[in-house]
Structure formats: structure tokens, C-alpha cells
Amino acid sequence: MKKKLLLIVWFVGICLTAVASVPVVTWDKYSLIIDGRRVCPVMCEVHYSRIPAAEWQQEVRKMKEGGVTVIACYVFWNHIEENEGMFDWSGQRDLRTFLEVCQAEGLPVVLRVGPFCHGEVRCGGIPDWIFAKGCKVRSQDPVFLKYVERLYRQIFTQVQGLQWKDGGPVMACQFDNEYRGSGDYLMALKKMALGIGFDLPFYTRTGWPELSKPVPFGEMIPLYGDYADGFWERSIAETAGNYYKAFNFKAFRSSTAIATEQLGEQEEKLNEGDEQYPYFTCELGGGMMTAYHRRPYLYPEDAYSMAIVKLGSGSNLLGYYMYHGGTNPDGKTWLNEMQRTLATNYNDMPVKNYDFQAPLGEFGQKNPHYYMLRKLHLFMHDWGEQLAPMEAVFPCRQDIPKGDDSFLRWSVRSKDGSGFIFINNY
């Protein structure tokens, strides 16, 4: 009896220790808080289905060496259910094994579960066969949501046991992408995910464009982005669009230059209350793809100076898109990734290459901005706890015109008599 009692006490003790060892993740208007300590994470986008599975561990380690502390990745629907009802989680589509690699390397993961992702994938990742169902995609159409629920259930089979509460790496997930309709649709996706079993510390959405109807406060943290250039621009001028604004320190968190091929012209406007969320990004241009009609070349300083500007403007999570390039996987029929579809305004993209001029290229090569950004990431690692609660102040003009170099571009983040000065002369 005594032995049984001791065994029960020992078992309960192990269970309590396991539960207690899971870090508590919360957030407030400034930052993420892990076990009571403020952090300024560095999040990198990498698409596991665009990298051979045998290379995942070495590539994740490269990201970690670059100062990355969180992995973000799309789960492309048409990569796993190209043919209706035939899910493929094998080889480089094996999400569960990728998550286990991230867990082994101590890196949390933010899953971007769609159903629409974009990611320069055909129809944004929505499989061709969906369009034959006669439903309205990216809406609360019951037929569409029936197939989305099946998708989410499949994703959950890969995630089950690897959620944050289980001691796993999956910390958060993003619903849809670059959506401008009613927040009711995003809330329907979240309700569906929770009903299936997703139970994560927080959930996200892209903060651009403005939603026609906002989601209730606290349901999804909006994440923002900016790029130095965009292949999606219809113009072939050297400096088209308003990308120059990404290099100005400013209070406005969002960008009106992202995905203009599908979103069109956008106002500089956030949904009411969004300023009360922490300022996080998920799509700082680590590089840029090239299309047939527009082939921008990105310099290492483009990514580096943009990151400095976002940090100096108050961001407490730098998320890059992309940080690691890749190669589009082979399809079972004809997985045409050239983007010649209405969903993305007929951009003519490479069939296989997705190098993105990223810090880590298509084959894992370390490009110059990998090393440049690493220095900034190490600064965030060492000083993030002090930096996170510091408000951003802008002594300079926030609307410096395109090509005007007569103004010093700088900002200050400070609190209680100490702070940091950020300068961008690029």
C-alpha cells in the first residue's frame, strides 16, 4: 500500500512538474510576455513544403544562428489536398515532422493556416477543385466552410500534442491572409478551429487592409508589414508605388503598398482600437520575388534599414517575409505555381523557384543581409526586455516626400530617463 501511495505521489509530481514547465505566454499593448518577462521576438517566414525534409534541421539551425527566435509558416491547402479528399502529409509536406524539428531546436511556431494564404502559390493556396463547387470562397458560405473545416481537422492531426499547452512549439496561428471583408468570417474560422481542438496562447490576422467590420478586441492580434518594392506593381518604373514610406519613421503601423494587385488602392487607416494591440509585424520584406513584368533587385540594406525603421517606430516583434527561400514542390497533376490566375491578377511567376532574394536563399545559402540582420537581432535579444515598454517618439517629419534627403530620419524610444536613438540614412 505504501509503495502504491508513493508511486501515485511520484506520478502526480511528474505531471505537475510537466504542466508547470510550460512557459506562460500573455501580451499587453506593448509586447509579448513570457513567464512574466517582456520579449522582443524575431520571427522568420519559411515554408517547409518548399524545402526538402532532409534539410529541415540544418536550415532551422541556420535561422536560429541568424538570431531568429520564432518560426512562421503557411500551410498551403493545395500542397496537401491538390486532389479532392486526398491529403498528402508525406515527405516535405510532413508538417508534424517539421514542427518536431522546430521543437527540438527550441523555436516556437506561428502557423498561418489559411484557407487563403497567397505566398505566390496558385490561387493563394485554395485548390482548383474548390472553384468547381459553386461556392463563394473566403466567405461564410456553408459549402466553402465545410471544406475549410475538413482542412482544419487535417491540420489539427499534425498539430495535436504539439500545441504550446502540451509543451510543444505551436504558439499561435493566423487565420486567412490580407482579408478586407467582415471580421465575422475571421471569427467563424477561429470558432471552427477552437471547436476542432486548437487551444493556443494567442491568434493573429494580417493588419492590412482595414476590415469592413472589425473583429472584437482581443480575439486576434493584427500583424503588419512593409516592403522595399513589389513584383505585383503594374508599373515597370524603377521606383514605383509608395514603397519609399517603408524607410520613414512613423506612427502609422500598416502599409498601403502590399498586395495591391488584389487589394487595389488602400487608405492609411487602421481598424478602431488596433493601436491598443502590441505593434508586431509578420511581413517585413526580407527580399522580393521577381515576376515576368517586374523584376526588382533588392539590396541587403533594403531589409536592414527597414527593420531598423520598424524597431524605431515602436515594433516589438520583427517578422520577415521571407527569411528563407525555397523551391515549389512537384504536384500530382499540374501544380502550376506561375500565379496566372484572377486571384492574384495574373502575375507571371517562376514555376519552381521561390528564392525571394531572402537572407537564406532557395538552397540555404547565406546572403549578405543574413549577417547584417543578425547584428540587429542580437541587439533585440540582449535589450528587448528594456526596449519593449519604451514608447516611440518622432522628432522628425513622418511624411518625408519621396527622394527628399534634406531631413534627418530618426526616432527615440525611451522610458524613465533612458532610451535608444534610431537613425536611418538609407
Question: Where does each model-flagged region fall?
Answer:
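Substrate-binding/catalytic cleft of secreted carbohydrate-active enzymes
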Residues: 22, 111, 115-126, 131-147, ...
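Aromatic-lined substrate-binding rim segments of carbohydrate-active enzymes
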Residues: 56-124, 128, 190-195
